[in-house]
Amino acid sequence: MRKTVIAVILVVLILVSVGIGLEIDRPSTGLVVYTADAYVAESDALIANFHNATGMAVEPAKGGGSYTLAQEISQGVPASVFISVALSTYARSSLGPRYSGWAIAFAADQLVLAYASSANSTVEKIVGLFSTANSTENASQKDAAYRNAFMNLTSGSVRIGISNASSDPAGLRAYLSLEIAGSLYENSQSFFTKRISENKAVRADSNAAELVSPLLSGNIGFLYIYRSAAISKGLKYIELPGQLSFGNSSMSQFYSEFHYNTTAGDQSGAPIYLYASALANGTDPAASVEFVSYIPGNDSFLSSYGMKPLEKPLLFNNTQPPAGIRGMVSAGRIVYAGPIPA
């Protein structure tokens, strides 16, 4: 009898321990949102609003460089929704088996040069030069003033934070912006990108968010980052001209004329949009589509982050989108904008 009782106790203990183990290892049943590192705060706000409206469980956003996240997603991480700042990350070549063939652009942003409130005199001098250029009305004098500002910025007297162009679109756009500046102010597209390399003026990291701490500590003087990220992180910033900021959708053709080479190949300029898509083979396909469908019309709060919610989001697709998205197109709430690049 005693042996029987002991055996029963042992079985119970084993079952309890196994149950505990299963509880620990059990995967989350909530939606998993992967988002560009600069937009974690905005994505978390969207997630909270969606949860409050629907009651659906969504995990806090997982951030990283958009190109790096696309690679991780293609390798099978349990992502449901992908919020990226680069349309090319939704291509089949980027997402592999997770490619769904569609994405919507729902908000616009722009590139800025951020600096810390405790900036030193050299940084403040360069800020002043950009301010002078911005306020100059005469066109030729304005170009000369911007040339002077960029000559000082790229002289090596301060270090500039630029994320890796192959892992983070913010870094790609920083180099594209410098290429455009070279074309406009020096008649030599690669002038400023070569100059910062020769003067060892750049501190790089995998994504722009990793460079905020060095900026605040004074290890770098400036950081190329999106305006919304600068605002959410409490940074001061220089607004760049429309030609250099990728913040003017009417200049799309102009931006596309400039290219920069990364490990993924030749990349061209484009207006900065924040995109979202439900991934193929996701953790909860129906809920993923519902989350993306929720964004249009419920993203006006993004203006407080310095973003511009699109009055009519743009659909990019190579495959037939889900019924809910098609319904929004039919109702005129979303407009077709073209294919996703290969």
Enumerate the predicted regions with their spans:
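Residues embedded in well-ordered beta-strands
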Residues: A105, Q110-A114, Y275-S277
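Short, Asp-centered acidic motifs that coordinate Mg2+ and/or phosphate
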Residues: L13, A79-I83, G221-F222
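Short, conserved beta-strand segments within well-ordered enzyme catalytic domains
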Residues: Y34, F82-S84, A105, A114
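Exported/periplasmic ABC-transporter solute-binding proteins
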Residues: V16-G19, E23-Y67, S74, S117-A119, ...
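Pocket-flanking alpha-helical
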Residues: G65-Y99, I231-S232
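N-terminal Sec-pathway targeting helices
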Residues: M1-I14
